[in-house]
Regions:
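Viral virion structural and adsorption modules
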Residues: 1-38
Length: 38
């Protein structure tokens, strides 16, 4: 998977600019795991 894209989604969710539902489905699991790790 694209590390830069995943990290960008994580950063946007943390900043309140996106929700997990707005992340493309193929990336949702990885993004959710990274959010839960912190």
């Amino acid at each position: 998977m694209n590390e830069v894209l995943i990290q960008a989604f994580v950063n946007r969710i943390r900043a309140g600019m996106m929700t997990i539902e707005q992340v493309p489905i193929p990336y949702q699991k990885e993004v959710q795991e990274r959010l839960n790790d912190d």
